[in-house]
Structures are given as C-alpha cells and as structure tokens.
C-alpha cells in the first residue's frame, strides 16, 4: 500500500470514528480498528501509528458538518459502522405486560455510575416489555444508612430519567419478615443458632453441622421469641437458613437470615432489635412483590444461591436471574463509605465533588443523563466483564451539548501582550456558535498612545519567541519583539489571516484586559485553573454549558460581574 493510499485509508477510519463519537476521533481506537481489519499493515505498525496521529489531529479540527460532508463524498460510512446496534438481548421467559423488575439500592449515599447501570438496564427492560419497575430501598443494616440518601436516590433517578412505578422501604416491612421467618422455622427450613461465632466458622469451614441445627421447631420458635424480646445480646443468637453443610461455596453454608443489631435505625429508632440480612429480606421481597426478573452483577451469584434456599423451603417460584459482567470504572471513587469519610474529613466538598463518580458530580460537570444512559446501553446486558469508557461517555455528551454551547475565550495563567504600532482600534466579531446562527460576540483591541493590550493563555505564551508572528483570532497579526517574565512585547504586523498562514503563525485566543472577567475552572482532579474569560460570558445563565475555545467544555456554576466559576466537563 502506497503512502497516499495509506493516508486515505486512515482518514476514512478517522472520519468514521469522529462521526460516531461526537466529532472527535480517538487515535487509539482508529489504530486498533485498522490493525484488526488490515492485518497486512501490522509489519508497518509504527508507520501507520504516525499517520494515524497526524490524520486524527487534522480531523479533530473539523466541524461536525465538515466531517459528515467528507464522509458523504466518500460514499458514506461503511456498513459495519452505519448499521444499528443489536441492542439489549431479550429477557428469558419475558412476556409483554407481565414483567416486573426492581432497582434496589442501599441508602448509604446518593447513586454513582455503578448504580446507574442497574437502574438504566432495569428501566429499559421495563419500558420494552411494558412492565413494572419497583424501587426498593434496602435499609435493613442500621449501621449503613444515611437518612439523606432516601431523597437523594429519588432525585438521582428522576434526573437519570428512570420511571419508577412502585416504591418500598424495607425498614417499613420488618413485621412481614418476622412472619416469614416464623413460617420458615415452622417448616424447619431454618434454626436459631447460639454457637460461638468462631466455633461455628470452624465447623462450617470443614463442612460439619453445628449442634443447634438439630433443634426441633418448638425450641427454635421459643428461642426466636427470646431474640425478639431482648433476652439475647448482639452476637449471642442468629437465625440460620438450612443448606447443604458441605455446599461447594462456603459462603452459602448455613447463611444468616436474622441477627441482633444493638444500634438505633435512623428511620425506625429503637423499635426493632432483630434485623433481617440483605439476602433474607431480598428473597422475601422478590416473592411478595412478584418480581419476575432479577438483573444483577456476577458478583452476586453467591447471593443468588443463598436466596434460592428461601424459595425452595417455602415452596415459592423463583424469578429469572440474569447475571451480567462486572463493570470496572477506572480512575473514579465509587465507594459511598469512602466518599462519606472524605466529606467528613474535609477532603471532599460534598457528594458532588468532581473527584468522585456520583451522578451528582457528573451532573455538576454538565454531563447529560441521556449520555450516561446511551453509554450504559452500549455496554448492554452481557456476562462479559467490561470497563466503563469515560471517553465514550464524553463523546456522547459532546455531541449533545455542542449544538447548545456558546463559544467564549478563556485565558489561564494569563500573560499580557503589549502590541505597539497600532494606529486604530480593531473590532473582532466572533460567532457565538460556529455551526449555528446564534448571533455574535464582539471584542475590541483599543490602542492608547499606539499601544494595545491583550491577555494570552499562559501555555500559548510559553511557545512564543522573539521574531515569531502570532495571530490573535479574528483580529490582528503581531510580531513578537521581546519576551519577559510574565509579559510579552510585540509590534503590529498585519491584519490579513492569509498573511498569518504564510508566516506559519501560531493562532491563539485572547482577551482584552478591559473586557475581561475573573474566571475559575474546577478540574476533575479538584484543582482549579484561574484566569480571565471574555466579558461576553456574563450573558449566560448559571447551569448552562459553554465551550472555552481551543480548551474544553464547561458548565457554568456561578456567573456574575464579580467573576465566573465553571466546572470542567470534557475536551
């Protein structure tokens, strides 16, 4: 394959990748696909990678319309790129109108991106089968309950667009669990165990029954009543479900259904002393709520095995269990307990701190719920483990917010450029949006005694040397004459953009000092970039997204004449 032919091939792949992911191609994804589909190029991988990087840089400078137009000139995307995804696979045994699913979070904090997967998958299947989605708050561990989480979960689901048909809170259902426990004891499917916990573990690990297992139901019911009336202290008695004592999974053997917790529950106070474990309450509720399908991660397979014993002992029909692969979310804090500790210690500012992966943090950054939903549905319901792609999420979000995001200039760690030799003011008219007729914004370079001033981005200033020609976007060309510590001095060179191109000039954004407003941008690592934004940004409302040209998209958090505070979304 000749060099030009290779470059044309790479360009097509880059255009297709950009069209698919919000107007920006990913060089790694382009390279991977080329190597997969053109094995003959593998010996030239180094050369191909160099070409990929060059071409991707070119494509990523194009507008969405330019990308679409060039793809159409090439005959449109290839079939494998253009065809629709197969979507979610059918649920086993599902009948339209007779599907009941549940989303069952623990109220230890608000929802994060991992919760979103379960919520979206259940919601999507409920919609597809005209079914019912139950929200069940699983709060039977008094030590893992945050009272504020109940409302936060509801708010997060509403923002995510998840439709809830029925709502239940397990701490309101304790008496029901007691009734089922008594029935289980009557049927001799469970027993009260008063063994020392360490001794029980020793017996369990070697596959032997403890002495308590042989108690008759009358004695078990008496001991159960003593558990309820406070005769026993925490750790002295539990209710165990009968299983095979030598079950291959030691975690399943004689698992605990009820235990004593001597701590007040944030919602019920000290009313209850005996609490069901998650596995017992879940099994009971899945039956009583007529759940037909349980969608859960593979890491819950052991829980499924445990819960089935309750169904078997009580003669209940089991739901269909569908276990999907584990979703790895790299570079993000998901643990609500870890986040809570960080909030309490002052490390994090709150549940929406940009360093954590809660839905609140993503919302604060300007991530659309639709982008989250699409990214989750792309992963689908597969038993293969997957890694959550932040790049795919950002690409989808970019595609959604780009049309509604006005453009402005923001210079970080600004360096002042003094432009000598300017005889008259230059009025720069810039579009609010490059592809849509949204009006314009105006910046003015106004000389005083022949000297105009402009603030440049610190990174751009670092690349300028004496003798360089730099173009201030939509304004003038300036020749750099002197580079100082934190300042530049230049001389007016020309107006025409074509001259700048001939000179190989660096093209930079800029802000006039007298038309600037202080601006801070909170980055994903919690750091803050400070500088000045053009004053035109003050016309925007807090909560809107904008693009700081040549930098990134942000969500405006505070907008006033005193300054702007924004939160980084993505490039």
Curated annotation (Swiss-Prot):
Catalysis: reaction(s): tRNA(Glu) + L-glutamate + ATP = L-glutamyl-tRNA(Glu) + AMP + diphosphate
Enzyme class, first EC level, given as a word: ligase
A single GO molecular function term of this UniProt record: ATP binding
UniProt KW Ribosomal protein keyword: no
Annotated signal peptide: none
A cellular component term, taken from the record's GO annotations: protein-containing complex
Residue span of region Disordered: 75-98
Subcellular location: Cytoplasm
Motif placement: 'HIGH' region: 105-115
Enzyme Commission identifier(s): 6.1.1.17
Gene3D superfamilies per record: 2.40.240.100, HUPs (3.40.50.620), Ribosomal Protein L25, Chain P (2.40.240.10)
Keywords: Aminoacyl-tRNA synthetase, ATP-binding, Cytoplasm, Ligase, Nucleotide-binding, Protein biosynthesis
One Pfam family cited in the UniProt record for this chain: tRNA-synt_1c
Described function: Catalyzes the attachment of glutamate to tRNA(Glu) in a two-step reaction: glutamate is first activated by ATP to form Glu-AMP and then transferred to the acceptor end of tRNA(Glu).
Similarity field: Belongs to the class-I aminoacyl-tRNA synthetase family. Glutamate--tRNA ligase type 2 subfamily.
PANTHER family documented for this protein: GLUTAMATE--TRNA LIGASE, GLUTAMINE-TRNA LIGASE
Entry protein name: Glutamate--tRNA ligase
